[in-house]
Amino acid sequence: MKKTTNFLITGILGMSVLLGACSKNNSENPGPVDPVKPVRSKYVFVYTGKGEAAATYIVSTDDITKGGVSSVNNGVEVDAWSFIVQNNTVFAQAYNEQGLVRPFRLNEQGKVVEAGRSVTTFRTGVSGKVGKDFWIGGGDPRSSGIGELYRFDAVNLQISGRSTTDLNKITGTGFNAVWTGLFEVGNKIYLPYYKFKHTPGGRVYEGEYGSLDSTWVAVFSYPELKYEKTIGDDRTGFIGDWSSQQGMHQIENGDTYAWSTAMGDGEHRKSAKPSGIVRIKKGAEQFDKSYFFNIEGATGSKISRGEYIGNGKFLMAVYTNAGATGGKIKMIIADVFNNKVTPVTGVPVHEFGGFKLIVYAEQDGKTINYVMQDDAGEYYVYIINADSGTATRGVHIEGADGVTAISKLNY
């Protein structure tokens, strides 16, 4: 098998998670939202400005349908590359050996402020929310084959559990299991993975991929974070990509859907299987062999990324050229209840810009706000209606060279 270089190295700083000990308390901590007071909310963005000396900011705005938002007299500067929102808090995560996590909320005036002590941890490659009060992070196992997980208490701002797993033993093939995402499914944690053998002495991303024509998911207990078993399928490729934090979602009826780009290693070797969506029925802990939604067959091209909207509908980016594994993308709505694809009108064809789609799904089950960069290098929010497949352009994120996250916080 040929040795390949992980094509995602350029974004390795993109999606990291952290945890650990302690740092400082902040007197501006706004605390949880008082349930007696009227609930107000603002949208928050994380973006990096343009220029060599540009910083990264968390900024807020009341309205994403028009106008512009920037860091001018707005928001806070952060030294982080990835972010997870839990318990009405934005956790800013640094991608380094110490891996500092800093919490941010909106205060009573609706301003973004640091909301408590910082927490140190290790370099993290996957993360995911569990319930309303916890999130889990996992380390980078590509060279070591050692999978470290931690459970982060988003209320008390502390680590509440850890585990270590030998990921080489999971595959039983001599290849390491490199997890590509972390998802809550029922009372378990599902971690999709691909098989990878690191080149001794090489960089962390240099090595040899295993089969590109199969799907694997490691099932872990919760809250113990102990490996239990692997479930697999052979109708598409592996789920997710390194540090993309997408590829699987449990929907309202308890069924879980997972999608594969089936793009191979992104450089030399391609998957022989189509890009599509598979299903795990509620409580089954195995793939449903009666269900396969062939997205590549329906659109003529492979999935790039996807995110759940609601009511069985997913927003998906697919490449514009058949067989492509990079470049221009267009947006579709994938209805997994009816195996139907609806093109999204109003969002221009554009370059795929990173590890995941930058989105925030509203609670109405049909609206998703998507951040994209246009051909002029400017970032806008597009407000997409999943029922009609239409989109309108909204707020301009001014001065942005990259946007990492969009969410909504109450205050």
What are these regions (language model features)?
Residues 288-377:
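Intrinsically disordered, low-complexity segments enriched in Gly and acidic/Ser/Thr residues
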Residues 38-45, 88-91, 133-135, 187-191, ...:
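Entry beta-strands of beta-propeller and related beta-repeat scaffolds
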Residues 66-78, 111-121, 158-174, 226-235, ...:
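Beta-propeller fold detector
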Residues 75-87, 118-132, 170-182, 238-248, ...:
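Repeated scaffold domains used in trafficking and secretory/extracellular systems
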Residues 137-146, 190-214, 257-274, 317-327, ...:
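Short, conserved, GDST-rich strand-edge loop motifs in beta-rich repeat architectures
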Residues 1-44:
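Bacterial Sec-dependent N-terminal signal peptides
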Residues 59-61, 105, 146-157, 204-225, ...:
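Beta-propeller blade signature
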Residues 55-159:
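Post-signal peptide N-terminal segment of secreted/secretory-pathway proteins
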